[in-house]
Amino acid sequence: MAKKKKILIRIGSLRHGGAEKVLVTFLKNLPKDKYEIDLLLNLYSGKYLAEVPDFVNVLYLNKGEMITTNRLQDIPVKAFRVIYQKVLKIFPALLYQYILKGKKYDVEFAAIHGFRDEILDSPQKSSKKLIWIHNDLKKTEFHNYTDEEFRKFFGFDKIMVISEKIQQDFEVLAKNEEEK
């Protein structure tokens, strides 16, 4: 029997949204005898958690509901979460050693564009890096992607997009056929 491919998938949570639903549907359609999957969530929460197949190992950085207010009683937990995640982003070796227990992956996959840097900054240089882009990055409200920021996505081995418009945006910025 062939050795299972080890895959790490990163996403913020499984709270709601199209990307989260697409990811869970994708996981349900993978053959469990071919893949060993670790799904790393920043926040263990969401309506799609119950739909994750049993063969997927769900890991998380924080547990509980997303804190969307600045109520006084919520600030310490919110601050801890932000600082903890920032430390792990700045020092990814800590994440891979202590949360992922030194596991080596064949593939590291950003299920949404917001995890671009986390995957590209992985200490596991030999893994294939994939990203799934679900949004028109020229219109995102959370981040202003300059051409330079956009070009960082070409650090991935494979960029998967959900529309022709997004594909065209990347092709315009591609500097050679390999990037296209």
Which role does the model predict for each range below?
Residues 88-101, 105-126:
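An aromatic- and histidine-rich active-site surface loop
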Residues 2-8:
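Extreme N-terminal starter segment of soluble prokaryotic enzymes
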Residues 9-16, 29, 33-83, 171-175:
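N-terminal strand-loop element at the rim of the active site
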Residues 15, 42-45, 112-116, 136-139, ...:
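Short beta->alpha connector loops
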Residues 94-104, 142-161:
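Membrane-proximal helix-turn-helix segments that form the acceptor-binding/catalytic region
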Residues 117-120, 156-180:
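A short, active-site helix/loop in glycosyltransferases that binds the activated sugar's phosphate group
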Residues 115-118, 127-144:
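A short, histidine- and acid-enriched strand-loop-helix "catalytic/donor-clamping" loop
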